[in-house]
Amino acid sequence: MAKQKGPLKYVGTIGDIRHFKIKGQEGFFAGMVGGPTDTQVKTAPEFQRTRENMSEFGGCAKAGKSIRVAMSEVLNGMTDPQCTGRLTSIMKKINLEDGTEARGERKVEISTQRTYLHGFGFDKNISFASISYVPYLLNHSVDRLTSNFTTLTATPASSINAPAGATHFRYINAIGVVSDFAFNAATGTYEPTNPELNELSNTTYGAYSPLNAAYAGEVLDASLPVGTVMTADVSVLQCIGIE
């Protein structure tokens, strides 16, 4: 893919060259117009591998979207422009781990590959660790219905890397459920194996604390509905943040 570095900045097609912007990236890009028709991609034998890739990419995108939906309340204003793409990329890595299904129908089995998501930052430019230096503990209930986020005592002036002009801060603890995804031959698409639990979530907010006074610490519990039974094909995620 070519990238324009000259003084001309425009988008659109000139001759056989298409000029465009990519969200989250600087500069203007260019590529040749053309390629196979939609019908060719969908039916021609030589595009079988392309169809398989498209099918699995769609499943990975759906799985990534479910994570974003489950954590949507805490993610408001806390993601970078490439967050969606980065999550889809992780889902694809998980998808490639499946050795039980045919290519084009491989599962997105998050429940067996959870380590891929451990430590994922929704904003790669500003991490939680770069903002808060307050010691904390994370715990989870055996039934996977409650996530605990406990912060310890601290001096905010030296423990919180707050933006200029800020006077207060608060912590956020979120819990969310994401199902594994499998290809449904009847519909020709990927679907959650447990749609009832998929995207179930809850978010708890701490009290606003002043930056110029001692912080006593607090306990934030985020819980899912009592009586909910977590199955083996779902993963329960915990996300913490500060604002």
What label would you give each PLM region?
Residues N95-E243:
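Charged linear interaction tracts used for macromolecular binding and regulation
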Residues M1-I126:
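Long, polar/Ser/Thr-enriched low-complexity segments
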